[in-house]
Amino acid sequence: MSSPEKKRKKNQKSSPNPSLPEDLIVSILARVSRSYYTNLSVVSKTFRSILTSPELYKTRTLLGKPETFLYVCLRFPDEANPRWLILYRKPNQTLTKKKKKKEDSSVHLLAPIPILNSPTVEWSSLVAVGSYLYAITADIKDSPCSNVWYLDCRTHTWLDSPRLRLAHINSDFNGRTYFPGSSEKPDSLNCVEVYNTNTQTWNPVPPQKRKLKFGNMEGKIYIPPCQENHRKAVALNPKVLTWEAVGLGTNLDRGSFCMIGNIAYCYDPSGKFRWMNCNTAEGDWSRLEGLEGLPKFARYSTVKLAEYGGKLVVLWDKYVAASGYKEKMIWCAEISLEKRNSEEIWGKVEWFDAVLTVPKSYKFVCAKSATV
């Protein structure tokens, strides 16, 4: 072996493996889809630390790389805490034509995620504000909660907000979350409180601003009806802080309803998908047209709707005959929406997949999208 070759090999053995600067690693990881973060976190402690750091998500925002993910919460028998899952497209998978896809394995799946400090209490409403999901406990018939838990979707950790006096239902508008109270007197400061998600502070709505009236819903927050206590749907105008009764009916399951922009979508007990423009005073439901290729749901199916990057996501379950009807399969469909005129909205089924097998006794708690 020649002398130069010996020298080169000696230098290779003696030189330590150089590591990349941390800011460069952050810049690289910020360009990678978050769906790969779980696998990347086992590469090293450094990667694991960076993947949960605020700097990474700030960089993703600056690079225009935020992604929307659908979070699904399920309850299982004999488990105190709920399970959380994220809808993923399997790596290196592309959507295929429906006829061919039936012969292939699923392209999408609901993948479990570890959640730290998950509260054991159940909530009746969940609202997304950026990368946070705020959970409010119980319905109006139950005792009021005094604090609000929120899930940080970047670190998958539950945190506790500052305490408030009363909160039940909520909705997000311009970085603030509104919490109407229960049957308090109209002059009570506990009637409505506003939580500023940026400053994490509570402020009561002044009594003179709490008024009930009828009118159109332009630019207002919709609060779904509740079957159990016959509460009708209402809307809040955040600009002037006034309430309005809304004629949306009371026969809708909260999970079978969602808002996309100013349009309300629902799946009614008759098996129809409907929509309503909340900017009109009439408040009439219209049938969602199209939906070619979407399977018919069984009458027993649990059906949930959620907004997902401007599209409509539908989740439903179906018994698995091969299991002796001891299991159910959760299915998911993504539907793009096209408003053709003031009277018609058409839905196009982009894909549908079997995403998770569950025991028949499971409970579907909620589905909500967050941007991280």
UniProtKB/Swiss-Prot annotation:
Signal peptide: none annotated. It holds the Pfam family F-box. The keyword Protein biosynthesis does not apply. GO terms for biological process: ubiquitin-dependent protein catabolic process. InterPro entries: F-box-like_dom_sf, F-box/kelch-repeat_ARATH, F-box_dom, Kelch-typ_b-propeller. It comes from the Eukaryota. Kelch repeats lie at residues 176-222. The keyword Oxidoreductase does not apply. Residues 14-60 form the F-box domain. SMART domains: FBOX. Keywords: Kelch repeat. This is F-box/kelch-repeat protein At5g48990. It comes from Arabidopsis thaliana.
